[in-house]
Amino acid sequence: MNFTVKYSFLVICLLCCLLSTYVSVIEGHRARPGESRKNPREIIKTFKESGKGIIQGYYPSWVSYNHNLKDLNPNLNVVHMSFAKMDLSYDSIESIVGSPLLFKSLIGLEYIGLNEYFNDAMNLRKARPDIIMLLSLGGETYHPSSFDSALNAVEKIANLVDELGFDGIDVDYEPNGSFDGLNDKEKADFFVQYVTKLREYMCDDKLISISQSSNGALSCIGFNDPKKICMDDEAPYNSKYFNKPDVKKELLRAAQMASAGGAIYLMNNLKDMIDMVFVQTFNYTNSTDSTVMKELYDSYAYYGKKYDYVIIMGFTLMFPSTPFNPNDKMLVKSIGDFVKTENKLNKRADGFGLWSLSSDNAAHNEQLAIEYFVESLH
């Protein structure tokens, strides 16, 4: 009898817990813009008005087993939660609550279940109501099984963003699970269609970020491109620029890579539908000239000013051989001074970002890098 009472009490507690989570999810995430926090667009606007650069970081969901979101560096302004599937599929939020182990297999985020994610996100929101949190899709981890499956998932993604309390979406453009195939027109057209549909389904206050390769805004010169998908004659880093005799050798090499110009077609078609571009500089290796990061930023800044994007130059903590070492104080200051000047002149909020936060395998010091970012941008 005593065992039966205890068992019944346990079942009731479990049902109450599930019901509580269900209600909070159905009503939407409690950390909504309003009395407790600003609209994410208003947060971005305050950075632009002050000329302060945004500091961003990718938080891989799989590190949540050893780390907590609320313990992130207080100087971070934007967090990309990675990675979810571009073609995610689930029947309803209630079904994930009822079977928490489905969260990873259906959504992609590597939490044990929805409750674990929800508590982690709420702790961050309580500690940092000013932080912007985006759900990052795709990347090397999850490229869609088909274009149609990804497009059919957009409405679910928009609902998930709202129900789980994200401030928007980041879409990592690696169509083959790598930087190969960036200049394939069919894949580029799909990406434009995918992001356009996301914008249609998401609330106006939500942000859209796209992640691109380091040389994505340099016109390609290494191969014939009759459709000019990776060229822009009106941009400063066009084919004429690369015919100049004084072009940096490493910048010329970047324009000759197969990934060169991979963002040009996307930005010129998406225009002001997106809000932020994260530049993944870790595809640029085997270089001894780290100064080209200035030109790489400048190539994206042209589109940032044209379409009002925030440009985030990404550093990596993972590879000791990267030419863009986030713990190189002089490099960070040099690029930061240039970015800060542009921000002040143009009322922009361009900044720096990290791949990836809280990684136990980091080759560089996360806290030191963020300290250097703050010193150089603010």
Swiss-Prot record:
Please state where this protein is localized.
Answer: Secreted; Cytoplasmic vesicle, Secretory vesicle, Microneme
Which PROSITE patterns does the record associate with it?
GH18_1 (PS01095), GH18_2 (PS51910)
Coiled-coil positions are none
Catalytic activity field: Random endo-hydrolysis of N-acetyl-beta-D-glucosaminide (1->4)-beta-linkages in chitin and chitodextrins
- UniProt record, GO biological process: chitin catabolic process; polysaccharide catabolic process
Q: Where is the GH18 domain?
A: 53-378
Result when mutating residue 203 to S: Increases catalytic activity and chitin binding. Loss of catalytic activity and chitin binding
Q: Per UniProt, what is one Pfam family of this protein?
A: Glyco_hydro_18
Gene Ontology CC entries for this record: cytoplasmic vesicle; extracellular region; microneme
The residues annotated as the active site are: 174
UniProt KW keywords: Carbohydrate metabolism, Chitin degradation, Cytoplasmic vesicle, Disulfide bond, Glycosidase, Hydrolase, Polysaccharide degradation, Secreted, Signal
Q: Which domain of life is it from?
A: Eukaryota
Q: Which residues form the signal peptide?
A: 1-28
Enzyme Commission numbers on file: 3.2.1.14
For this UniProt entry, the molecular function terms from Gene Ontology, in alphabetical order, are: chitin binding; chitinase activity; endochitinase activity
Q: What is the effect of changing residue 220 to S?
A: Loss of catalytic activity. Loss of chitin binding. Loss of catalytic activity and chitin binding
pH behavior is given as: Optimum pH is 5.
Q: How does it assemble?
A: Forms a hetero-multimeric, high molecular weight complex composed of at least CHT1, SOAP AND WARP. Within the complex, may interact with WARP via a disulfide bond.
- Known role: Endochitinase that cleaves beta-1,4-linkages between tri- and tetramers of N-acetylglucosamine (GlcNAc) from penta- and hexameric chitin oligomers. Does not cleave smaller chitin oligosaccharides. Required to cross the acellular, chitin-containing peritrophic matrix (PM) which is formed around the ingested blood meal in the mosquito midgut allowing the ookinete to invade the mosquito gut epithelium.
Per the record, the similarity remark reads: Belongs to the glycosyl hydrolase 18 family.
Q: What is this protein called?
A: Chitinase
Protein species of origin: Plasmodium falciparum (isolate 3D7)
Q: What is the lineage of its organism?
A: Eukaryota, Sar, Alveolata, Apicomplexa, Aconoidasida
